[in-house]
């Protein structure tokens, strides 16, 4: 019986040793797994924080860029408004020329157009006093003296604020103040911008 007791005791001791070994191994495995998971969680945390910081920087840069673009666009719009106002004031000044200066503008412009003498000068109703019958007769006489037909006529139905349109057989040459300023605007806008904003 003592052999049986010894055998039982040996089995129990071996089982106890195996249990301790298994528990120690399980504890080591547990610690390894926990350490690995903790390290992974720490790495994930760092990665998430890094990504969040990068996204925050990108978002911040985008917001700043959009704000700068918006300010730039507002400034450009304001500059364009000022430049448009300058050109509109130029049109107003032309509309307020004295009768003598206005006639000089019309005569010098007509001289540069090489008239045939059969054209129609389209003006607005407001300018009919400047383009009187005497003015028209003098213009036609001058054309006749140059060997051209002297039969220019007036049409007072223009829907513009100043200047004139010359109609030559259905082809219209626009010499209104608006057309004059608009044709020069492309050339002058850069210079006006320099004068106003530099």
From Swiss-Prot:
Keyword Phosphoprotein: no
GO molecular function annotation: ATP binding; proton-transporting ATP synthase activity, rotational mechanism; proton-transporting ATPase activity, rotational mechanism
Keywords of this entry: ATP synthesis, Hydrogen ion transport, Ion transport, Transport
Keyword Ion transport attributed: yes
A biological process term (GO) from this entry: proton motive force-driven plasma membrane ATP synthesis
SUPFAM superfamilies recorded: V-type ATPase subunit E-like
Pfam families: vATP-synt_E
GO cellular component, as recorded: proton-transporting two-sector ATPase complex, catalytic domain
Family that this chain belongs to: Belongs to the V-ATPase E subunit family.
Function: Produces ATP from ADP in the presence of a proton gradient across the membrane.
Alphabetical list of HAMAP family matching this protein: ATP_synth_E_arch (MF_00311)
Protein name, UniProt field: V-type ATP synthase subunit E
Organism field: Clostridium perfringens (strain 13 / Type A)
